[in-house]
Curated annotation (Swiss-Prot):
Protein name, entry field: Elongation factor 1-alpha
Chain residue ranges for the region called G3: 91-94
Chain positions with N6,N6-dimethyllysine modification: 55
Expression sites by tissue: Was detected in all tissues examined but was most abundant in roots and salt-adapted cultured cells.
N6-methyllysine carried by residues: 261
Region annotation G1: where it falls in the sequence: 14-21
Gene Ontology MF annotations: GTP binding; GTPase activity; translation elongation factor activity
Phylogenetic classification of the source organism: Eukaryota, Viridiplantae, Streptophyta, Embryophyta, Tracheophyta
Known function: This protein promotes the GTP-dependent binding of aminoacyl-tRNA to the A-site of ribosomes during protein biosynthesis.
Species this chain originates from: Nicotiana tabacum
Any single GO BP term: translation
Length: 447
């Protein structure tokens, strides 16, 4: 074995009929971890149901169906390998929880693959005012997915087939749209493909010999691997806290930024409780250091389980320790709220692992979501499709950070009526120092 390949996450976005499932299914099918026997079973079933055309999408549909029925599917099925990377496909956006997942940081994508239906009528439907293509691209950009690959799909079904004129027209239109969202289209490869026939997916297609750019596989290899934020101060949002006999209190969570090591003195925001980390474990093995992306449990000295809760954030007490937010200002995009949102609105915020009601204390401005420029000062309300700057006050102590400093703790979903009604990124935080915070003896010795 040479050097381990880097892992990257890609999110596949696009209009509902653009061919996301077929294209993703094709990659997983050709490059991925699906057992050949499973595929043969799927193919046989598809043939029996006269769904031959649906071969690759069928693979994905079966996986989704099995997952939704609660049959745990080995997540390797959603992975495939390129020459340079192990790629994991993050939930395709048809999935209800996609937006919430994308925001609460269960999955930060390194790159978005935008699939476009190049057929007559298909493209127009996807990019129209209410098409999902726009919303997905905007969401990806707002949530910090800075790299994108565009696939002009269904090139085998354009008129005439594999039409360069159609491709050029789409590139021009999509580029101007992506530019408004905030992407630089010059940095985005536009790959003409057929997810079904396989043109330009992995091998270069003779049907598209007018195109000189990369195939989809080559474009994936050109993604810049994410700089993992291990040089930032520690932020580890707690998912759970356990009491383990003979060991004591063990908080569990994923390192988002920084490094966690045994012997470190940590401060838990928002309460300011400070103690020493005795040991750090991942998959029942002791670690000398835990890095961003690691899901770990760590043992803390002289701390009762009741003093820590899900949503608290562990940080290094000597390096910008986490504190509660008195208030914070966010840029919010209203996505599916049936009415109007005015001052005093109090929904629930899902930010990292915390789930807390906040008050929209003051809608400061309404902004143009394309340019980010202010359109109106102190508007009375925001409605569907609007973007604005809002001052928010948490109803209980909570830790949030600015998106620019700590991205996973600076983006959130606004939940109301059992759905995501808005998404946002935090621009600044007014932090408050904890009063009467407990510092354990172990931590005092280390001072």
């Amino acid at each position: 074995m040479g050097k381990e390949k880097f892992h990257i996450n890609i999110v596949v976005i696009g209009h509902v009929d653009s061919g996301k499932s077929t294209t993703t299914g094709h990659l997983i099918y050709k490059l991925g971890g699906i057992d050949k026997r499973v595929i043969e079973r799927f193919e046989k079933e598809a043939a029996e149901m006269n769904k031959r055309s649906f071969k690759y999408a069928w693979v994905l549909d079966k996986l989704k169906a099995e997952r939704e029925r609660g049959i745990t599917i080995d997540i390797a099925l959603w992975k495939f390998e390129t020459t340079k990377y192990y790629c994991t496909v993050i939930d395709a956006p048809g999935h209800r929880d996609f937006i919430k997942n994308m925001i609460t940081g269960t999955s930060q994508a390194d790159c978005a693959v935008l699939i476009i239906d190049s057929t007559t009528g298909g493209f127009e439907a996807g990019i129209s005012k209410d098409g999902q293509t726009r919303e997905h691209a905007l969401l990806a950009f707002t949530l910090g997915v800075k790299q994108m690959i565009c696939c002009c799909n269904k090139m085998d079904a354009t008129t005439p087939k594999y039409s360069k004129a159609r491709y050029d027209e789409i590139v021009k239109e999509v580029s101007s749209y992506l530019k408004k969202v905030g992407y630089n289209p010059d940095k985005i490869p536009f790959v003409p493909i057929s997810g079904f026939e396989g043109d330009n997916m992995i091998e270069r297609s003779t049907n598209l010999d007018w195109y000189k750019g990369p195939t989809l596989l080559e474009a994936l290899d050109q993604i810049n691997d994410a700089k993992r934020p291990s040089d930032k101060p520690l932020r580890l949002p707690l998912q759970d806290v356990y009491k383990i006999g003979g060991i004591g209190t063990v908080p569990v969570g994923r390192v988002e930024t920084g490094v966690l090591k045994p012997g470190m003195v940590v401060t838990f925001g928002p309460t300011g409780l400070t103690t020493e980390v005795k040991s750090v474990e991942m998959h029942h093995e002791a670690l000398q250091e835990a890095l961003p992306g690691d899901n770990v449990g760590f043992n803390v000295k002289n701390v009762a389980v009741k003093d820590l809760k899900r949503g608290f954030v562990a940080s290094n007490s000597k390096d910008d320790p986490a504190k509660g937010a008195a208030s914070f200002t966010s840029q919010v995009i209203i996505m599916n709220h049936p009415g109007q949102i005015g001052n005093g609105y109090a929904p629930v915020l899902d930010c990292h692992t915390s789930h807390i009601a906040v008050k929209f204390a003051e809608i400061l401005t309404k902004i143009d979501r394309r340019s980010g420029k202010e359109i109106e000062k102190e508007p009375k309300f925001l409605k569907n499709g609007d973007a604005g700057m809002v001052k928010m006050i948490p109803t209980k102590p909570m830790v949030v950070e600015t998106f620019s400093e700590y991205p996973p703790l600076g983006r959130f979903a606004v939940r109301d009526m059992r759905q995501t009604v808005a998404v946002g990124v935090i621009k600044n935080v007014d932090k408050k120092d904890p009063t009467g915070a407990k510092v354990t003896k172990a931590a005092q010795k280390k001072k």
